[in-house]
């Protein structure tokens, strides 16, 4: 089966499974792999010390992008994975927990994922999408939501850092020595924008939660993952441990969603750790659903 036919069948299938998926483009530059009804490209990403992205990704990542056709897509993906893992195994130190093999797939295109499970991959994170107007309950009474200011930088950074630390055991995020500075710099950037993008929740005059968002053009990097004219991105929502489950997160989400909807954005995107027992049920209760799922094997080789 020629590559163009594989890509066309792949695009038709994933498009039918989820209308919010963008049409798959041509495979990017990299090392090409092929089997009878499958095509893939692999590339290596190294994040040097000091780079902000090291908080969100392993330092050394081998990635695979696939196009699948035919009826036995699990078998096709399995054959591509075997080629790929055989290709990269001599480039990875066994047991290097700062290395990973990563495959991102449309969340609703599920038939082939058993091939990943059988090779030790786990679904670690999701890029979730919310269409405008969708949401859950308004949140608890007695919670004040206010825009953060430069005077709130320290408490906002600590709240954001708490979210990162809580998500770290689930496999994708890695707190580094530089993480606090990375988060602080991100908040400084957001706080310096002309419109409020960071909000704090207060209860009994105490800061108990944070949410921050990105609007276009800052959020355009995320918008490439969804079939929409424009997209906002919800970067962080966190509530102090003693207040979780009390409606503060819902109040923060409702406020952020009102701002995003008022901006005329058809969709909002966010990343969350799939195994997080708080974030997964919470986000889907306030209008999100999975769009892309990241499957990871970390370390890449044991």
Where are the model-predicted features located?
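A short beta-loop-alpha structural element at the N-terminal edge
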Residues: 1-8, 144-159
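Conserved GNAT-fold acetyl-CoA-binding loop/helix
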Residues: 3-29, 167-186
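Conserved donor-binding loop and adjoining core beta-sheet/short helix segment
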Residues: 21-86, 208-230
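Short hydrophobic/aromatic beta-strand element in the GNAT-like acyltransferase core
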Residues: 29-33, 195-200, 210, 236
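Acyl-donor-binding surface of acyltransferase catalytic domains
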Residues: 69-142, 292-300
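Conserved acetyl-CoA-binding loop-helix of GNAT-fold acetyltransferases
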Residues: 73-90, 236-239, 245-258, 262, ...
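Conserved active-site alpha-helix within GNAT-family acetyltransferase domains
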Residues: 107-123, 250, 262, 273-292
């Amino acid at each position: 089966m020629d590559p163009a036919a594989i890509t066309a069948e792949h695009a038709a299938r994933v498009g039918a499974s989820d209308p919010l998926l963008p049409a798959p483009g041509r495979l990017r530059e990299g090392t090409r792999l092929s089997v009878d009804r499958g095509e893939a490209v692999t590339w290596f990403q190294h994040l040097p010390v000091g780079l902000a992205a090291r908080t969100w990704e392993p330092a050394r990542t081998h990635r695979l992008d696939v196009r699948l056709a035919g009826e036995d897509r699990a078998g096709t993906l399995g054959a591509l994975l075997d080629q790929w893992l055989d290709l990269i195994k001599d480039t990875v130190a066994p047991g290097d927990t700062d290395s990973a093999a990563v495959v991102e797939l449309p969340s609703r295109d599920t038939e082939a994922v058993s091939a990943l499970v059988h090779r030790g991959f786990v679904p670690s994170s999701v890029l979730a999408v919310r269409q405008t107007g969708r949401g859950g309950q308004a949140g608890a009474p007695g919670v004040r939501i206010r825009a953060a200011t430069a005077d709130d930088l320290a408490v906002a950074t600590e709240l954001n850092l708490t979210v990162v630390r809580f998500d770290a055991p689930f496999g994708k995020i890695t707190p580094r020595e530089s993480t606090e500075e990375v988060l602080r710099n991100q908040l400084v950037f957001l706080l310096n924008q002309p419109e409020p993008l960071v909000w704090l929740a207060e209860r009994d005059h105490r800061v108990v939660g944070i949410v921050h968002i990105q609007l276009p053009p800052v959020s355009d990097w995320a918008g490439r993952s969804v079939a929409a004219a424009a997209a906002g991105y919800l970067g962080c929502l966190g509530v102090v441990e003693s207040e979780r489950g009390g409606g503060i997160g819902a109040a923060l989400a409702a406020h952020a969603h009102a701002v995003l909807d008022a901006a005329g954005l058809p969709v909002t995107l966010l990343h969350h750790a799939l195994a997080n027992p708080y974030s997964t049920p919470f986000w889907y209760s306030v209008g999100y659903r999975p769009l892309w799922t990241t499957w990871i094997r970390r370390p890449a080789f044991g």
